[in-house]
Regions:
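Short glycine-/polar-rich loops that comprise or flank the Walker A/P-loop
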Residues: 172-173, 388
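Short, highly charged
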Residues: 52, 109-113, 119-129, 140, ...
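Basic, low-complexity terminal or inter-domain segments flanking catalytic cores
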Residues: 70-72, 159-160, 164, 181-499
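C-terminal accessory/connector segments of nucleic-acid motor ATPases
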Residues: 73-94, 122-165, 173-174, 342, ...
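Conserved short loop/turn motifs at secondary-structure junctions
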Residues: 46-49, 131-140, 149-155, 178-187, ...
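Phosphate-backbone binding and catalysis cores of DNA-processing enzymes
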Residues: 1-123, 127-133, 230-291
Length: 499
């Protein structure tokens, strides 16, 4: 029908101009900023080259900021009031309600005393019991980045490894197009998935009953599908021989996508949540427990559920007013540093980069464009950071190298280079070009002005840097590369990348 209703090409010329302007601007920033920083750093004795980019540099800086926060984190002790509660039918634990943290033990003891209670054993009573039936829907279908994040979490595969495995499954006509940014499908996809439910269940080796037979907005929403729908299995299910030809990661990814798709048709996970409030003098303790009532879709993820098991206790049967023996305790704990990025959590951070900026307009634009990078490019950006030796992976955690740290310190004062805000500012105006409300020439002129600003500011920024950590690291690397002494001149013989 599209070919029967062809539109004049000039109707879409502004979109071409928008994309062309973005490409020119990226090129201008990269071709000027990269040699500018490289040459200025080389003048200070730093070897190697440094490349910068609108997406690459803010991504590196995200990891750098997180690493700095971890390295500079100072643990602080705090105290909380907890309770071990014993009733006729069993025992359970409770936490102070509302939760409070105390900086010192003395502060906690004074608080407990002010509530006519004490640390240690004393009598209490069950003040309230509430039980509600709750449900949990099956997980959303996968976009590329959500699948990459999940596979990294479960199997420690890198984003690029997942994309490569996905590409193979797509070319084998087993999974849909991988480079998609939406977790939704249309009613057409829902219909064929429903028709092939039996084949997918058979592949999983389970006799499953389809319960959710009507499309639900959580998964099926044509208005949220543009070029490509969520990642789902095709009508073709692999044979035993086809499965045997797949590598291990491909088998795991295919099974994960099939399970997530099949789960959409299974019953919800149902459970009872019970909240017990226990009163000791004027102290109130809350205890929460969950009792599964219907396993539903979780039957597909039993192993995964075991690994991700919530720390939720099973509560005994109690009645309001029941007597309880309560052991009130002072629990000493420590504040915890932020967690280092993995490739999976970094992908999520790139997609939700709006959370790292303060400007409301920038936040709005970043939400619209879904952060920095695209579904198709984020994996290659992370891979590029590794290849350029800005970051390395240690036990699945992303760590910034001394070279990466030096670059981040060098660009630190140039907010537009380190923040996702540049993407927001660009996209705001680029969208205007696409709507014929903006001018390509004006935009490129502003980019050139920014480059002139960099030419003036960067040499001063480099002058202020402390190179001691970088030089120390380089000296250690140089020592490791020494393989012996030259018998003729007595100088060190060193291993280099090439001869």
């Amino acid at each position: 029908s599209g070919f029967q209703n062809l539109q004049p090409g000039m109707n879409y010329y502004p979109f071409y101009q928008e994309a062309q302007t973005r490409q020119i601007a990226d090129w201008l920033i990269g071709m000027n900023a990269s040699p500018l920083y490289t040459l200025n750093l080389q003048q200070k004795g730093v070897q190697g080259t440094f490349s910068l980019g609108r997406v690459q540099t803010p991504t590196l800086y995200l990891i750098f900021q997180r690493q700095e926060a971890i390295e500079n984190f100072k643990k602080e002790p705090f105290f909380e009031v907890e309770a071990s509660i014993k009733v006729n039918q069993g025992s359970f634990k409770g936490v102070l309600s509302p939760t409070q943290r105390f900086k010192t033990q003395e502060e906690l003891l004074a608080f407990v005393s002010s509530k006519q209670a004490k640390i240690g054993n004393q009598e209490g009573r069950i003040a309230d019991v509430q039980t509600k039936e709750k449900k949990t829907n099956s997980p959303s279908l996968f976009s590329l980045s959500s699948l990459q994040s999940k596979v990294n979490q479960l199997y420690k595969a890198t984003a690029s490894q997942t994309l490569k495995a996905m590409q193979g499954l797509y070319e084998a006509k087993l999974l849909s197009y991988p480079r998609t940014d939406t977790p939704f499908i249309t009613e057409n996809e829902f219909a064929y998935l429903k028709a092939n439910f039996g084949k997918y269940s058979g592949f999983l080796g389970l006799d499953l009953e389809m319960v959710q037979t009507e499309p639900r907005k959580r998964y099926v929403d044509g208005s949220k599908v543009q070029e490509h729908h969520a990642i789902i299995p095709t009508k073709q299910v692999p044979t035993e021989s086809a499965l045997a030809k797949m590598d291990d990661l491909q088998r795991k990814i295919y099974a994960l996508v099939v399970k997530t798709t099949v789960a959409m048709f299974l019953p919800d996970y149902l459970y009872e949540e019970t909240k017990i409030q226990t009163k000791v003098a004027d102290l109130l303790f809350q205890s929460i427990g969950k009792t599964p009532k219907q396993e539903g879709w979780k039957i597909l993820f039993k192993q995964q559920t075991k690994e991700e098991k919530e720390d939720v206790q099973t509560l005994p049967l109690v009645i309001i007013g029941e007597h309880a023996e309560v052991d009130v305790k002072s629990a000493e704990k420590e504040t915890q540093p932020p967690k280092a990025f993995t490739e999976g959590t970094l992908l999520t951070a790139m997609k939700t980069a709006n959370k790292t900026v303060d400007d409301e307009e920038a936040i709005k634009i970043l939400q619209e464009v879904e952060g920095i990078g695209t579904e198709a490019t984020r994996a290659s950006i992370i891979e590029a950071l590794k290849q350029k030796e800005y970051i390395q992976v240690i036990k699945n955690k992303l760590v910034v190298t001394e070279k990466g740290k030096l670059l981040c310190q060098a660009v630190e004062s140039q907010h537009l280079l380190t923040s996702a805000e540049m993407t927001a500012k660009w996209e705001t105006y680029l969208k205007k070009i696409g709507k014929r409300e903006g001018n390509q020439e004006n935009f490129i002129t502003n980019i050139k002005k920014f480059i002139v600003h960099l030419l003036e500011a960067v040499p001063n920024d480099i002058e202020k840097l402390n190179f001691s950590d970088y030089q120390e690291q380089k000296e250690k690397e140089a020592e490791k590369s020494i393989v012996g002494k030259c018998p003729k001149c007595g100088n060190n013989i060193v291993l280099k990348k090439s001869f």
